[in-house]
């Protein structure tokens, strides 16, 4: 029955002659998803025990099932009343099916000798024909697989056997023999032939050309796989599981043979070797140098004068910043006491003014304004010193007003927050850079994509691209419809025996 199904290339369910159409439909529904029965018959199952006596095990409908999910063939017996699987036997390699009687067929099971006693000899005849046809196709396919690896290797082996030393010895021998006697010349040729046979008998890379490390049943031998082939498979994204898979490894092996063999693939791979990757770009540009690197650190506190009285609360201010840099301006040192809280910022004024005078040497008689306030970030450099304005927060010039200044500092609430837009414009390039650092939001962010170069994409042409295309077609066929699967699995069983997913 299976031979009649060759034109459509898809096996259809074949029911039993003794069952009604409704019973056959029920039987087909018990087979399972993507399972097809190639022949069905009503049988009794017998098994031979150790005492060599046949004993009946069960009765039901025997089916020669093509199990596409498991990619194998089984003999299964179903109970159509309860819809249960009663027994099964996989058609292993070298499976032998005997028919001592037309209605009584025997074979070796996994644990004992098994027999099928058919209720109808016509069904028995058709069932036997379906099984023997299947076993014959599998046998022919196995023979072709055994002969395939040895076929294309003969011319390749003769091409690879090249020994420049042999030609050198031949040329050298001819010169010597031209001088010697004719008999000595013949002896020299005989010795030369023995040397040539020894060299030819041990070619360097004949083994790799011979079998490629591939077996029809187990796939590629990963332990003895050629490193260049392994590199090719890695470039194409072929996993070890795919190399061990019987069907996928067969597709890969056929691709290598169609390309010209292992040496042709290796030569093409060397020719298409990608250029070295460009040097990786550096990360983001280094941040600007810290402000203190461009100027000297603040001088230590001097011992002149008495320090101002401490405030009533715990000091929380940061250490005084280094003085700002202005060309042509003498910068005053910071206040002597580091525990002294920062004075309030002075309001900017549009009137030009000279640089601030040096700090007072004593608590009395001082008329100079305080040093410039620090910026909001503690480690940042201070803005240029502001100029006093005519407002209420003008710094007093007398020593009597010094106490009022301290009271304002202690109150804290009257201190004005320094806004970004209220900073005076710096007059030098370095001050402008410091202002940008303090503002922060004006700095350009560096994207993470610039830190590392993207990986070099795999080549999509040549031998690598062709193999990748073959594997993509194979993957699409596995996950596509049954019709697509028939095309890719044609290598497993020819004619109508492709697997279906």
UniProtKB/Swiss-Prot annotation:
Main location: cytoplasm
One annotated Gene Ontology cellular component of this protein: cell leading edge
Modified residue annotations for Phosphoserine: 239, 480-481
Domain WH1: 31-138
Region of interest called Disordered, as start-end residue ranges on this chain: 135-158, 180-202, 263-405, 442-501
Residue span, WH2 domain: 401-418, 429-446
CDD domains in alphabetical order: CRIB (cd00132), EVH1_WASP-like (cd01205), WH2_hN-WASP_r2_like (cd22075), WH2_N-WASP_r1 (cd22074)
Covalent S-S links between cysteines: none
Listed Basic residues bias regions: 183-195
N-acetylserine modification, residue list: 2
Any GO molecular function: actin binding
InterPro entries listed in its UniProt record: CRIB_dom, CRIB_dom_sf, PH-like_dom_sf, WAS_C, WASPfam_EVH1, WH1/EVH1_dom, WH2_dom
List of residues that carry Omega-N-methylarginine: 304
Modified residues (Phosphotyrosine): 253
PTMs per UniProt: Phosphorylation at Ser-239, Tyr-253, Ser-480 and Ser-481 enhances actin polymerization activity.
Subunit structure and binding partners: Binds actin and the Arp2/3 complex. Interacts with CDC42. Interacts with FCHSD1. Interacts with FCHSD2. Binds to SH3 domains of GRB2. Interacts with the C-terminal SH3 domain of DNMBP. Interacts with SNX9. Interacts with the WW domains of PRPF40A/FBP11. Interacts with PTK2/FAK1. Interacts with PACSIN1, PACSIN2 and PACSIN3. Interacts with NOSTRIN. Binds to TNK2. Interacts with SNX33. Interacts with NONO (via second RRM domain); the interaction is direct. Component of a multiprotein complex with NONO and SFPQ; associates with the complex via direct interaction with NONO.
Function (record text): Regulates actin polymerization by stimulating the actin-nucleating activity of the Arp2/3 complex. Involved in various processes, such as mitosis and cytokinesis, via its role in the regulation of actin polymerization. Together with CDC42, involved in the extension and maintenance of the formation of thin, actin-rich surface projections called filopodia. In addition to its role in the cytoplasm, also plays a role in the nucleus by regulating gene transcription, probably by promoting nuclear actin polymerization.
Descriptive protein name: Actin nucleation-promoting factor WASL
Source organism per UniProt: Rattus norvegicus
């Amino acid at each position: 029955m299976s031979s009649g199904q060759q034109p459509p290339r898809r096996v259809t369910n074949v029911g039993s002659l003794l069952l009604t159409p409704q019973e056959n439909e029920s039987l087909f529904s018990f087979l399972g998803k993507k399972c097809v029965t190639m022949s069905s018959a009503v049988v009794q199952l017998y098994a031979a025990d150790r005492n060599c006596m046949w004993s009946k095990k069960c009765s039901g409908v025997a089916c020669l099932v093509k199990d596409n999910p498991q990619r194998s063939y089984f003999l299964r017996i179903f109970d159509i009343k309860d819809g249960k699987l009663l027994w099964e036997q996989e058609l292993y390699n070298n499976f032998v099916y005997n028919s001592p009687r037309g209605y009584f067929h025997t074979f070796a099971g996994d644990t004992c000798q098994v027999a099928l006693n058919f209720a109808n000899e016509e069904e028995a005849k058709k069932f036997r024909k379906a099984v023997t046809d299947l076993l014959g196709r599998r046998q022919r396919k196995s023979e072709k697989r055994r002969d395939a690896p040895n076929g294309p290797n003969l011319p390749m082996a003769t091409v690879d056997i090249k020994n420049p030393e042999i030609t050198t010895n031949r040329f050298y021998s001819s010169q010597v023999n031209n001088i010697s006697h004719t008999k000595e010349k013949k002896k020299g040729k005989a010795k030369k032939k023995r040397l040539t046979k020894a060299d030819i008998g041990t070619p360097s890379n004949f083994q790799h050309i011979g079998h490629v490390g591939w077996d029809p049943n187990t796939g590629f031998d990963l332990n003895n796989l050629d490193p260049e082939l392994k590199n090719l498979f890695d470039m194409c994204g072929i996993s070890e599981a795919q190399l061990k898979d019987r069907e996928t490894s067969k597709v890969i092996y056929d691709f290598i043979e169609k390309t010209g063999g292992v040496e042709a693939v290796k030569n093409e791979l060397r020719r298409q070797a990608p250029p070295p990757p460009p040097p990786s770009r550096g990360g983001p540009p280094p941040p600007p140098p810290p402000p203190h690197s461009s100027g000297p650190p603040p001088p230590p506190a001097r011992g002149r004068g008495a320090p101002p009285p401490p405030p009533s609360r715990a000091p929380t201010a940061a250490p005084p910043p280094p003085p700002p840099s202005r060309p042509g301006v003498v910068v005053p040192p910071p206040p002597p006491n580091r525990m002294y809280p920062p004075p309030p910022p002075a309001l900017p004024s549009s009137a030009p003014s000279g640089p601030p005078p040096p700090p007072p040497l004593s608590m009395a008689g001082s008329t100079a304004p305080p040093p410039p306030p620090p910026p909001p970030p503690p480690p940042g450099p201070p803005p240029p010193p502001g100029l006093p304005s005519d407002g209420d927060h003008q710094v007093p010039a007398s020593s009597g007003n010094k106490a009022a200044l301290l009271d304002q500092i202690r109150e804290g609430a009257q201190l004005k927050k320094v806004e970004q837009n209220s900073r005076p414009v710096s007059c030098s390039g370095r001050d402008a850079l410091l202002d940008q650092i303090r503002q922060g939001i004006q700095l350009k962010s560096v994207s993470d994509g610039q830190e590392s170069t993207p990986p070099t994409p795999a080549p999509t042409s040549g031998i690598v691209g062709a193999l990748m295309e073959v594997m993509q077609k194979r993957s699409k066929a596995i996950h596509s419809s049954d019709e697509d699967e028939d095309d890719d699995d044609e290598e497993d069983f020819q004619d109508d025996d492709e697997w279906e997913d």
